[in-house]
């Protein structure tokens, strides 16, 4: 949801979804197959290497921001038409996060998205680049 949901603490930029106590996981017993992977030193090393490769290229902060800007440019006038037809900016529509009420313009929404993604990636850098 990239920070735009009011459940399972999706507005948080830190933490893994599967570790959220409100989320029961894939298995009614609480064990998920990927938890076993996270106990494997070989897997963790491969994960770290892969993360660092992507962060140095297509998942760098600059590349992600450019991708967001590219999407905005591609959408062009459709953005304005969308909010003329559905004037929802500044409204909390489930499952939007509660902070949506403070974002009253499209620029506010884009700024929030960029900020949220950047903060999320910084947290992921800390935990995946050990």
Where are these regions (language model features)?
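Middle-to-C-terminal accessory/interaction subdomains
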Residues: 1-130
């Amino acid at each position: 949801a990239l920070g735009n949901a009011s459940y399972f603490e999706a507005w948080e930029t830190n933490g893994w979804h599967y570790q959220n106590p409100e989320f029961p996981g894939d298995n009614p017993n609480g064990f998920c197959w990927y938890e076993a992977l996270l106990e494997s030193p070989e897997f963790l090393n491969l994960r770290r290497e892969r993360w660092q490769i992507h962060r140095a290229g297509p998942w760098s902060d600059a590349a992600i921001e450019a991708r967001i800007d590219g999407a905005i440019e591609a959408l062009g006038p459709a953005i304005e038409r969308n909010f003329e037809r559905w004037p929802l900016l500044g409204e909390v529509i489930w499952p939007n996060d509660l902070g949506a009420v403070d974002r009253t313009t499209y620029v506010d929404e884009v700024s929030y998205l960029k900020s949220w993604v950047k903060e999320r990636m910084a947290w992921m850098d800390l935990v995946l680049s050990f």
